[in-house]
Amino acid sequence: MQDVKTYLSTAPVLATLWFGFLAGLLIEINRFFPDALVLPFF
């Protein structure tokens, strides 16, 4: 039962950090490459 409580308290925290990082990354990409339909990295 302790493992379930640990999972329920950890997964939302990790998801929040991951989605926050992903949102920040997308915002920065759109800042340097505005209105890009295809990322011009290659």
Swiss-Prot record:
<comment type="function">
    <text>May help in the organization of the PsaE and PsaF subunits.</text>
</comment>
<comment type="similarity">
    <text>Belongs to the PsaJ family.</text>
</comment>
<feature type="transmembrane region" description="Helical">
    <location>
        <begin position="7"/>
        <end position="27"/>
    </location>
</feature>
<keyword id="KW-0602">Photosynthesis</keyword>
<dbReference type="InterPro" id="IPR002615">
    <property type="entry name" value="PSI_PsaJ"/>
</dbReference>
<dbReference type="GO" id="GO:0009522">
    <property type="term" value="C:photosystem I"/>
</dbReference>
<dbReference type="InterPro" id="IPR036062">
    <property type="entry name" value="PSI_PsaJ_sf"/>
</dbReference>
<keyword id="KW-0603">Photosystem I</keyword>
<protein>
    <recommendedName>
        <fullName>Photosystem I reaction center subunit IX</fullName>
    </recommendedName>
</protein>
<keyword id="KW-0793">Thylakoid</keyword>
<keyword id="KW-0472">Membrane</keyword>
<keyword id="KW-0150">Chloroplast</keyword>
<dbReference type="GO" id="GO:0015979">
    <property type="term" value="P:photosynthesis"/>
</dbReference>
<dbReference type="GO" id="GO:0009535">
    <property type="term" value="C:chloroplast thylakoid membrane"/>
</dbReference>
<keyword id="KW-0812">Transmembrane</keyword>
<keyword id="KW-1133">Transmembrane helix</keyword>
<keyword id="KW-0934">Plastid</keyword>
<dbReference type="Pfam" id="PF01701">
    <property type="entry name" value="PSI_PsaJ"/>
</dbReference>
